[in-house]
Amino acid sequence: MILFKPCSTFDVAYNIYKFDSELRKLIITELEKIEVAVRTQTAYILSSQWDGDWFTDTFHFNNSVRHARILSKIDEEYQLSDEEFVKAFKFKYSDPFLPSWITMEMSSLDTLSILYNNLLPGRVKWSIAAYFGLPDTVFASWLHSIVYIRNIYIIWKLNLLVIFFLA
């Protein structure tokens, strides 16, 4: 037996659905802009301060065990990627890792967040956060929150697809 709240109507339910849909579109559009900026600034600042494979050097990171896990995750994302630029790199080069500017584009936002949090404190980490007008600790927290919100959106979308598929 399905119960409805008193005074509920199809119009009320539809208006809530429309509002929810528009809010989700707005949030994901803005999150995508932030994601592109984070990828770009991370690749640009770190590659200009160090070199193209800086992310492979344990010297730049707080925790070597966490760094090894990050490299493993990057390698997993590299092996599973179906991006054309990744396929072209694999075809042309035998390097185990892509240059950082390609790696930052290919990696998940979650991986980038973990990578940023594991960077040694200092000028480079501060420079990335400063681009966004934030102290590095606040930026790290916001980046983690953005990953969380984005994951909620993705899970919601996947659940919606499953519901429609099963219906």
Predicted regions and their residues:
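Long, contiguous internal "core" modules enriched in hydrophobic/ aromatic residues
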Residues: 1-167
